[in-house]
Amino acid sequence: ATEPPVVIPMHSAFGNKLLARYVFDSVVVTNHQAEAPNIYHYIPPKGFPRKLQDTDAVPWNQKKLACMFAANKFAVSRNELYTERRKIIKCFEKNCPENFDLYGAEWPNILSVYKGYAKDKFRTSQKYRFSICLSNVTHVKGCLDEKLFDAMFAGTVPVYQGVDEITEYVPAECFIDYRQFSSPVECLHFLQEMTCKEYEQYRKNIVRFISSEETKKRFSAVGMASAIEAAACAPKKYSERKLWILKLLLLYDKMYHKLCALNRKIEMRKMMEIDA
């Protein structure tokens, strides 16, 4: 499983406990739930190791300030980061529209910074100094997605929030921790004031990290296969009770997405009214 609970509720602590207790002996999924000891978690960044892009393809003084690659999603969860993404977009659109671009699905065209889909995410990213990389959710241990790594491989410096224990995976000197800012405006000012020398130091740190043998081993497909082989056990045979529990979880997942769709309509209407 590679999605957090805000996308697939079955991956929540509640869902994991039911799966571990009633459906499987051991499941290789995506989290570190202490209360569900039969659950093992591993999310490798997609496509790792990817070839490092030419980090000097676009000179510093020709790069725009920042970009974001994200879909316009909504979720009914106190840990979701979709709302914070929209706050950042609004802030950057208001204060530096000429230096920020947004790419992704389902954004309203009334946003002046919206550029639609990027044909090549990595080549597009090279045109920017920073990439805003907020995950779908926070406070879900081990839920490390591809956004942070995509930015680093493209040669940009990521502004990241997601996994609370991120420095267990990636050194602090390789990214800008969005949690240090009290508001999107404070983050914007920090990025605008960074010197070329400071920026290049981040990029040197990134190259050193992603080029290391330890990183390649930990986040490669081979590394994932090894983790699965070490953790996985044979599943129990299905019984009628287990099938009923699984169907209940699938129904829970379906109802959650209907609620999210309703929330999306309400929030989109609010966005349109504000811009009007």
Regions found by a protein language model. Give the residues of each.
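Active-site proximal beta-strand in glycosyltransferases
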Residues: 1-5
